[in-house]
Amino acid sequence: MRFLFLFITILLCSTTIKAQRLYSESGDIYEKSKRNVVDHAKLGVFYELKFRKDSTKLDDYTEAQTVLMVSDKHLLFSDYNRLALDSINDYLASSKQNKKDQKAREEWMQAIKKWTFFFVTLTDLEEQKTTVQTYDVLRSYEYTYPTPQMDWQLVSGDSIINQKACKKAICSFAGRNYIAWYTETIALPYGPYLFTGLPGLIMEIHDEGRNWIFTNNGVGKMPQYSDMYLYKKRYFKDLIVTTRENALTGYRNDIEDFDNLSIEIYKVKVEKNGQMVTPEANNPKRPSNMLELQW
């Protein structure tokens, strides 16, 4: 029974990480998101993302709806439902009447469930610097570094993706080999995440093992949510601003050692001989299959 209690406690902690940041300490008042808005998107490029959290489970994909937001000076890539969640949350937080809006509350919960990709990349096109924020897991991280330059090879091959004629290219990035399909009919050298530099918009890109698959499913003006922003540090009490190496190492450790680290972070207790005690942190590691394997 004590192990069941421990499992349930950790599970509840992990599934409420995002939600707990959107409430006041009293638990019944929505708190407006705190953002650093740097620009406004002129264009949205949408990508369906499928990724494996465990590379050994070949048919077990997590899905996300992501968006590349484009302005003259910046690119921002994130889960689209992050934008939706913040918008709904701020509406609920704006008045006592709004927080009772049952439809909005239900949409808020749905957006939380749909937000599954927890990296946000903001690229300054003039300075060629990228700031990345990662959320969820146990802690949140932020780092800024020179925007990576992809060493593309244009190779033979053609395809039709989302009704666009595409050509093939390959590259290696952060420990994975990628195959990309780009269209010269949209003369933007951009793509999902940090994949840029081809002579046309990337319509699909995936690693050779198909662990991470981005497929374009729309291009056009942002119908809503045009603000390009990262969160202010004070919005996440646990946001760690550090180097890329430290951030990605920490993020990987948080995934793999979640069951042990969460005992300390969430101050988990179990019953033993009639007393509540801290359990031993000797659980096996979980698998991780991050997009970036090397840094």
Predicted regions and their residues:
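Sec-dependent N-terminal signal peptides
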Residues: 3-13
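Structured soluble/peripheral alpha/beta segments that form catalytic or ligand/cofactor-binding pockets
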Residues: 52, 61, 177-179, 187-224
